[in-house]
């Protein structure tokens, strides 16, 4: 997949900006606060229907304006052109058009423009809350598996209904009967999600080991998927997983009624990352943690290509300030051999095959 052009208006601190990246590596450079990251976020909007630094569309609307727009053009590896337009106004909410047709559901667009990001805030994948790691795995899988995305959305709806029932003040007999129905629905969907996640992590970890060979330390990486199955983690048979979930919910029933929330399921799962069998979050340095995340992102690019047949666009925000020159340089060179890479930095990074775009110069040329 390749971004051919993008035009943004009233987005973050940009009144109007037009950008055409190169086919390989493009370096967007400029002073801090000049709006480099905003360009990447606009691209991310067109790929995944939201920015990568937050889910509130209003945050991206330039102060004092009533509407932001993004217009973009992409070309797939098979030469198929796709035009994506985004418009947001607090009065009309967000609208997304793909090839001039308005999306009825944003989720239907996920996977059309595969995209991998590396941003400073994503270190929370390594050392943040479990929800950050679940977001990583869900965003990855949803870009190539539409059934998983559908199951995930269904699971969230059932979970919301189940939690509402657990919190209700209705007749206990009604709650007990309705809870059984919702639990059966939740178990069926949870099983599908867990199976896909387990298979993803198994293959992803294998690929991560291959990618990690270029890291100077040469450590052995591994990822452990912690699900609600407890000591039954190694189960891969659907009926057995469903049985374990049912037993788990039966055991937790009184506790769930007391706490008024669902206490088991994919929404409570987590990932643990290891180097040489030592947990990264506890024992690795910041540099080692960053290098691990970089390796994960490089692995994800290859994984999505293998799973979907389309090379993702790679967006690297402030890469050179987060990593040493050897690691960052190797990352860019490796990714660039496979697809389009767009990087932001404060200084100009020149080299063979690198296109450069100065945000400061562009803004100066637009000033009256």
Swiss-Prot record:
GO cellular component labels: cytoplasm
Keywords, alphabetical: ATP-binding, Cytoplasm, DNA damage, DNA repair, DNA replication, DNA-binding, Nucleotide-binding, SOS response
GO biological process: DNA replication; DNA synthesis involved in DNA repair; double-strand break repair; SOS response
Annotated localization: Cytoplasm
Superkingdom of the organism of origin: Bacteria
Entry keyword annotation includes Zinc: no
Keyword DNA damage: yes
Molecular function GO terms recorded: ATP binding; ATP hydrolysis activity; single-stranded DNA binding
Binding-site residues for ATP, renumbered to this chain: 30-37
UniProt-listed InterPro entries: DNA-binding_RecF, DNA-binding_RecF_CS, P-loop_NTPase, Rad50/SbcC_AAA, RecF_2
Family matches, as NCBIfam families: recf
UniProt function note: The RecF protein is involved in DNA metabolism; it is required for DNA replication and normal SOS inducibility. RecF binds preferentially to single-stranded, linear DNA. It also seems to bind ATP.
The family this protein is said to belong to: Belongs to the RecF family.
Classification via HAMAP family: RecF (MF_00365)
Protein name (record): DNA replication and repair protein RecF
Organism: Chlorobaculum parvum (strain DSM 263 / NCIMB 8327) (Chlorobium vibrioforme subsp. thiosulfatophilum)
Gene that encodes it: recF
């Amino acid at each position: 997949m390749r971004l051919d052009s993008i035009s943004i208006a009233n987005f973050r601190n940009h009144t109007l900006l037009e950008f055409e990246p190169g086919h390989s590596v493009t370096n967007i450079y400029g002073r801090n606060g000049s709006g480099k990251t905003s360009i990447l976020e606009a691209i991310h909007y067109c790929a995944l229907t939201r920015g990568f630094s937050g889910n509130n569309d209003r945050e991206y609307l330039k102060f004092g304006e009533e509407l932001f727009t993004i217009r973009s053009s992409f070309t797939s590896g098979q030469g198929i052109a796709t035009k994506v337009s985004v418009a947001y106004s607090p009065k009309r909410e967000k609208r997304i058009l793909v090839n001039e047709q308005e999306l009825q559901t944003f989720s239907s667009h996920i996977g059309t423009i595969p995209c991998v990001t590396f941003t400073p805030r994503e270190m929370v994948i390594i050392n943040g809350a479990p929800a950050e790691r679940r977001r990583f795995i869900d965003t990855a899988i949803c870009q190539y598996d539409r059934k998983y995305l559908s199951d995930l959305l269904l699971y969230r709806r059932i979970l919301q209904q189940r939690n509402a029932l657990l919190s209700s003040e209705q007749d206990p007999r009604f709650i007990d009967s309705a809870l059984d129905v919702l639990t059966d629905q939740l178990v069926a969907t949870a099983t599908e999600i867990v199976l896909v996640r387990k298979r993803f992590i198994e293959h992803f970890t294998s690929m991560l080991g291959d990618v990690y060979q270029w890291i100077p330390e040469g450590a052995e990486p591994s990822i452990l998927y912690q699900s609600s199955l407890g000591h039954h983690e190694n189960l891969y048979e659907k009926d057995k997983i469903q049985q374990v979930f049912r037993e788990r919910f039966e055991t937790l029933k009184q506790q769930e009624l007391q706490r008024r929330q669902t206490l088991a399921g994919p929404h409570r799962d987590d990932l643990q990352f290891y180097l040489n069998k030592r947990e990264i979050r506890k024992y690795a340095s910041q540099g080692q943690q960053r290098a691990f995340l970089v390796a994960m992102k490089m692995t994800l690019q290859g994984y999505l290509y293998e799973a979907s047949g389309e090379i993702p666009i790679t967006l690297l925000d402030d890469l050179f300030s987060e990593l040493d020159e050897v690691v960052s340089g190797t990352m860019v060179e490796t990714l660039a051999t496979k697809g389009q890479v767009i990087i932001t930095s404060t200084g100009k990074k020149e080299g063979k095959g690198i296109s450069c775009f100065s945000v400061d110069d562009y803004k100066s040329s637009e000033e009256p």
